Amino acid sequence: QKGNNFWYEYKTSNGKAWYVVDPVAKTKRSLFDLDDIAAQITEIVKDPFTAQQLPIQKLEAGEDGRTFTFQITSSQEVKKDSTDKDKGPKKEIFFFSYDYPTRKLTWLQDKKKETEYPDWASFSPDGKKLLFIAQVKTVKSTADKHPDLPKATGIIVTDLMYKHWDEWVTTAPHPFVADFDGNGISNIVDILEGEPYESPMKPWGGIEQLAWNTTSDKVAYTCRKKTGLEYAISTNSDIYIYDLNTKKTENITEENKGYDTNPQYSPDGKYIAWQSMERDGYEADLNRLFIMNLETGEKRFVSKAFESNVDAFVWGADAKVIYFTGVWHGESQIYALDLTNDSVKAITSGMYDYEGVALFGDKLIAKRHSMSMGDEIYSVALDGSTTQLTQENKQIYDQLEMGKVEGRWMKTTDGKQMLTWVIYPPQFDPNKKYPTLLFCEGGPQSPVSQFWSYRWNFQIMAANDYIIVAPNRRGLPGFGVEWNEQISGDYGGQCMKDYFTAIDEMAKEPYVDKDRLGCVGASFGGFSVYWLAGHHDKRFKAFIAHDGIFNMEMQYLETEEKWFANWDMGGAYWEKQNPVAQRTFANSPHLFVEKWDTPILCIHGEKDYRILANQAMAAFDAAVMRGVPAELLIYPDENHWVLKPQNGVLWQRTFFEWLDKWVKKAPSK
């Protein structure tokens, strides 16, 4: 949201569209004349783009509400570095600014200094400068070391973090500041000149990890100033403030040893806020909100009253309140944090998740979704009343009947209460018996909230005549710190008992066919599936594991973010005197393969460097060698997620073919 309007992107199978909305006048206009801008881009990029195939990415609005920046990836190939192991050619990227009222497009290039592959951008409040991100080479290629071997493809590795998420690491994103005169950029300065560090931090950090101050002469940025092994075992990032005039940098969070991320200056310029985790190496630590008085340096932990993570946040116009989203009891709501007394009050309620929040006069703008509806944009008044501003998928929803979603509180084996979501088929008949699926969440510290997924979509499962049981088992945020932290070092413990509680309680219902139960999950949920396959005592008729851990010892060494393995597994498997680590590795699913007796489908992406695909291959091989019916779906070009549309369709078809064969069509006693 900028100025008096907000903009949004709308994706369909036919391409993308971009709209500008005035919520007061209740008008919606296309941001681009698609035919015109396609012609302009084609002329500059020398690629024949059409209005339906505009590869516009990373669109950002300027403070004036009329100027936008974005990037275009052309089909033109550029020379690849020999350390670049991504399959396929490398494409040239172009960076543009666009004036919305005049429809003028400008190719942003500094004629004095070339900066390769500019990325996310942010205009300064005075509109005279541009902050953007560009990749800087940090790893010498084989060709650099051996120029006489230009065709050599081998990579020489000398330290950790050589892979991250889904890429071989050869560059680091750096923040750059440039003068902007409306026609182009000049006087580019690399804030991290000569430093091998990342800002924003990979793999998902974007422009939200950097911020302009109100006077346009300072930039706050997030950075973990570590490389190699030190990077791999630490989450200790900090907030730095760079002065454009003096070129000096100040670390304002040096005393904190965990994550410090996402700075935001207050509208009056007197304070800066950021998100902070306390402990080094613990990526699922409580995400707290801090503010600092820029004059006195006084820092304050202001979100103590909210015993869950502070997610997206935005300052109120008077700098006396901060609005934020956070998960509590399986829902992500918008809250108001009163900075006069640090009290927290919920603004929204209901079975929804609000995601992202922006201030818009005396209202807030946010995305909202649920298990029954994908993202739409809402206006939220401070009294909690809401107005839906977009109806992009109404014509589809009007043709569908969604299944009922309800929350049930269940007593766990240790006497606590656990929220479990139950999703019923459309036209549910309590007099019938339904095949039922236990859903195992990933993370492991990710909430089973009112999320909407194109892959793990509960309404699609329900429409295929399954009941879905989705427990908020131990190790999820939104139920207090103790509940969230219990899972670390106890992967085969209470969380697994919680799974059994959820499915056993539901199996008591007359409409749940206890002879036709399935179990599915991804990531930690995939680990859960592999573990349950050796412990379920014939509860389930079939399993599906996506990107799951099968062998914990191999996972400890294979995963790239070692801080996660150290914290959640409790240490290395060779630490024989470490009882927590030894308990973790004693619960590795591969140790219980002799008990596998139930059909299992294993799914994995070969570009998944968080959990390598050989985990699924090993699980599949073990099942086949045990004589257990098994199937393996491997994606050579997908990471920890399935992102390509037709791969997603293949996933759904394979998923339901397996369940229908082994669960739905299983004999019912």
Feature-to-residue mapping (PLM):
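Short beta-strand element of the alpha/beta-hydrolase
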Residues: 424, 432-442
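Active-site-proximal cap/loop segments of hydrolase catalytic domains
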Residues: 457, 462-463, 470-669
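The serine-hydrolase catalytic nucleophile loop
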Residues: 433, 444-458, 473, 614-615
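Beta-propeller folds
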Residues: 1-345, 362-363, 371-373, 379-383, ...
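Glycine-rich His-Gly loop
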Residues: 135, 224, 369, 439-443, ...
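N-terminal cap/lid segment of alpha/beta-hydrolase-fold proteins
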Residues: 176-178, 391-431
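Conserved blade-ending motifs and adjacent loop-strand segments that build the rim/top face
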Residues: 303-311, 345-356, 390-401
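Core-facing hydrophobic residues within beta-strands of well-ordered domains
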Residues: 56, 207, 260, 310, ...
